[in-house]
Regions:
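Switch/coupling loops of ABC transporter nucleotide-binding domains
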Residues: 1
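H-loop/switch region of ABC-family ATPase nucleotide-binding domains
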Residues: 7-8
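A short, surface-exposed alpha-helical micro-motif characterized by mixed small hydrophobic
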Residues: 13-15
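Short, glycine/charged-rich "phosphate-handling" switch motifs in NTP-dependent
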Residues: 19, 31
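Catalytic metal- and UDP-sugar-binding loop of GT-A-like glycosyltransferases, i.e.
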Residues: 23
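Charged, flexible cofactor/metal-binding loops and thiol motifs
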Residues: 33-134
């Protein structure tokens, strides 16, 4: 079975999916298994979404982090990466040319000129054993 879920809540998506596709301004910017994405996020927008997932270890009424700036104007296609104006890692190249959406390692695709550093990152508590594969659920 396949389910298409559209959400800004990657924590919720992780509880239902084996694989996550992250989109920004109508374009796919990162795609990987839940475990790979949460453990080794590469796209700054994906990282921002993960940072906004509510967590039980935060004090009550703590505001969630927000992505600075405004969403892009979808009526005018950007020459470069549409996330560049809001991205903390952006450089001139990002505004000038759109990065290719490529598979940078088996099963992990992303489109970013200046991705977050590669390397293991702890999977968020409570997400290590979620999703249909972990629970034996049907696809």
């Amino acid at each position: 079975m396949a389910i298409l879920m559209i959400s800004h809540d990657l924590g919720l998506a992780a509880s239902y999916a084996d694989e996550v596709v992250v989109m920004y301004a109508g374009r796919t910017v990162e795609r990987a298994s839940v475990r790979e994405l949460f453990g080794n996020v590469r796209m700054p927008y994906t990282s921002a979404l993960l940072g906004a997932v509510p967590r039980l270890d935060r004090a009550a009424h703590t505001p969630l982090p927000v992505v600075p700036g405004r969403p892009p104007d979808l009526s005018a296609e950007a020459a470069g990466c549409p996330f560049a104006p809001r991205c903390p890692r952006a450089a001139d190249k990002c505004a000038e040319r759109r990065p290719a959406f490529d598979e940078h390692k088996p099963g992990h695709w992303y489109a970013c000129w200046y991705p977050l550093p590669d390397g293991p990152r702890a999977v968020e508590a409570g997400l290590a054993n979620t999703g249909p594969s972990a629970t034996g659920g049907a696809r």
